[in-house]
């Protein structure tokens, strides 16, 4: 049941373990770049050819306009239509033809550019040609991103009987071992839990793997997964195709490229480290710190009926704002690292499904998550750096859609805001509003603040003795359903 927010008043073949006859496209897809002659192959695997979307020099042919033009078979094109993918994004246009040529790929593109489709479609098409279990492995840095990728694979593979296993930390390992024992076609995993299964789960092997994908590779390495990735690579066959996708090309990513890719082609869509998409409208509001909540409620009221992500800096502030909004009749749900894994996935699913139209989040959701149709991002607390700002506002205006991002700047945030503007290379405009209109909400906001304060205190008192994340403790590493971490989200259902 959808809980809409009210304004505050004042080809259908199935994958079988045998050969499959697939209807090939009538027109052979044109390669984006000419095949590399043996004499032109780089001597070192560290080198790679680069295709820069900004140059427009890699092909004289017009850019493909449909997935069929890229060489994708009809059954997968139909799945794209079901998902509302009307035409390929730039990263998909550049990457898919190369992947269909059986090449390793490094894809560099900003968040929200359609990277999942860029690697999922070629993998599924190859699976249709030569079906086998444990065909592809996708590694992601966070549980939420892994869950999102698995959902995309399942949606794209819905017409071809795809089997996909999601392997995450924080969930039952025995149930995951059972799922792996059923020989899925695609495994989507976080690195730590996958390594646990490779080392401990009897009968589980990836020695016949055909495809490896590392999504958000820069973040995988920023989160110190490097040693775990090294161990995982030892369990994989060297004869495979590898796709590495990243927002940036750091020295760590280059080292990873040398370790696991063979003669890769580099596809670069991003032209600036701090680039945002042209369909994103960015503004700020300069406000007194003491009235942040009132301005927040005013803006949520202005965007009533639209989907909003509100970013805060701390777990406790995320909880407080969610309570504040719910008290005022708005469908808000929190997302932060203090929640159990099931509660975090539940929050994302409720927001995606539309049963909640406001997601209040820490930066756990600021990168990599594909949440479709987010209309507005509100930076209630400014991020600590420009890179995080770009990742936050990238939650809206995705895949060619329009979006709006508004940042709250108080008297204490001026220096930080100027640094963000400098990194963006532009002076953003102030969002137009009338202070008198905002202050009409103040009495109701103050009452809601008192209620939120009382609820937060009760929650902290209830959890404090158990190492509450809200009180700054580490919390418990594990716990059965119904334990303290799940209690934090009890009123979200």
From Swiss-Prot:
Enzyme class: hydrolase
One MF annotation (Gene Ontology) recorded for this entry: ATP binding
Entries under Pfam families matching the protein: DEAD, Helicase_C
InterPro entries: DDX47/Rrp3_DEADc, DEAD/DEAH_box_helicase_dom, DEAD_box_RNA_helicase, Helicase_ATP-bd, Helicase_C-like, P-loop_NTPase, RNA-helicase_DEAD-box_CS, RNA_helicase_DEAD_Q_motif
Catalysis performed (reactions): ATP + H2O = ADP + phosphate + H(+)
Annotated Gene Ontology cellular component terms: cytosol; nucleus
Region span, Disordered: 1-67, 462-493
Alphabetical keyword list: ATP-binding, Helicase, Hydrolase, Nucleotide-binding, Nucleus, Ribosome biogenesis, RNA-binding, rRNA processing
Motif Q motif boundaries: 65-93
Protein's UniProt name: ATP-dependent rRNA helicase RRP3
UniProt source species: Chaetomium globosum (strain ATCC 6205 / CBS 148.51 / DSM 1962 / NBRC 6347 / NRRL 1970) (Soil fungus)
